[in-house]
A protein has these predicted regions:
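Membrane-anchoring hydrophobic helices of lipid-metabolizing enzymes
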Residues: 1-103, 108-134, 138-141, 209, ...
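Non-catalytic C-terminal accessory region of glycerolipid acyltransferases
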Residues: 1-35, 49, 53, 145-312
Length: 312
């Protein structure tokens, strides 16, 4: 009886935190609706008139990030003043990305637009929240328009597929996606790589998921439930921008970004410099890999890093 109770309790704990995140997201949208009604706002969701409530939302999520994950953000200085495309690794639950958006707004008063999968826009009751926080579809025209208006635009080429079917090896699941590179070349903007340490240790997907893979490929809906929510250490690293180069092809740019995001968690020593010299990003890479991601990911190590005050 005791063992059974403990098992049930453990299962509940592993699902409570992800469900709590969903609850807070919907609560945030309700607060936005109240704010909109009280202030009789009908402005463009991307307008600065929403900055006051954006700051409130960002402050809440930043406090949550500090308490639950000891969240740190490094490399903000690598973000261009103007437009650019942020390319990042997609965790099982991209809560780390929400932390990044919140801290970026608090530190820089800057709104980064986020490309999301189509299913996100079908979620009930989140229209206002998605608009005010700058979540947009991944259509080429919308991305180009945002970049021409001077926004940072973020995208995870792996998207939902990477969230569901990558694992503790942190392998990228990009397939043949290269739209982000085409947009960057057309808009003549840099691409900035980004990843969060231990994101797969915080939230995971079940390993036996062949059925869910087939289900996703046929429906494009994420039926695989995430679990976890352990208070592991999260550190987001922003790498040095890959500048616009009119002589590079889309395929070469895709591979360049893919190599950076893949190799950053694996390089164990600064003197392994072929990667650094090849892509001329020595300073940024050294900052990112000063404390590398353990491959495969290790939950216990990620938890213990909460007590390690040295910068990773």
């Amino acid at each position: 009886v005791i063992i059974g109770s403990l098992t049930i309790s453990t299962i509940l704990v592993f699902f409570i935190v992800p469900l709590t995140i969903v609850f807070f997201i919907y609560l945030t949208n309700i607060l936005l609706l109240i704010y909109q009604r009280n202030n009789e706002l009908e402005a463009d969701p991307l307008s600065d008139v929403w900055n006051r409530v954006r700051k409130t939302i960002a402050t809440f999520w930043d406090i949550y990030a500090r308490i639950w994950h000891g969240y740190e953000l490094h490399g903000v200085e690598n973000l261009p003043e103007g437009p650019g495309i942020l390319v990042y690794y997609h965790g099982a639950i991209p809560i780390d990305y929400l932390y990044f958006l919140s801290r970026l707004f608090l530190w820089k008063k800057r709104l980064c637009l986020s490309v999301a999968d189509h299913f996100v826009f079908r979620l009930p009751g989140l229209k206002l929240l998605l608009g005010v926080t700058g979540v947009i579809p991944g259509r080429r025209e919308e991305c180009l328009a945002a970049l021409r208006r001077g926004y940072l635009v973020s995208i995870s080429p792996g998207g939902v597929r990477e969230a569901l079917f990558s694992d503790q090896s942190y392998q990228l699941v990009w397939g043949k996606r290269k739209g982000f590179a085409q947009v960057a070349l057309e808009a003549k903007v840099p691409i900035i790589p980004m990843y969060t340490q231990n994101v797969r240790e915080g939230y995971r997907m079940f390993k036996e998921r062949r059925f869910f893979r087939q289900l996703y490929e046929s429906t494009r809906l994420p039926f695989t439930p995430p679990y976890g929510g352990l208070p592991v250490k999260f550190r987001t690293y922003i790498g040095k921008p890959i500048p616009y180069d009119p002589n590079i092809t889309t395929e070469e740019l895709v591979e360049k970004v893919k190599t950076i995001v893949t190799v950053l968690p694996r390089i164990k020593q600064v003197h392994k410099g072929k990667f650094l010299f090849s892509f001329q990003t020595k300073t940024a890479v050294q900052a990112l890999i000063s404390k590398h991601q353990t491959i495969p990911g290790n939950i216990w190590k990620a938890l213990l890093e909460r007590f390690d005050k040295r910068r990773k």
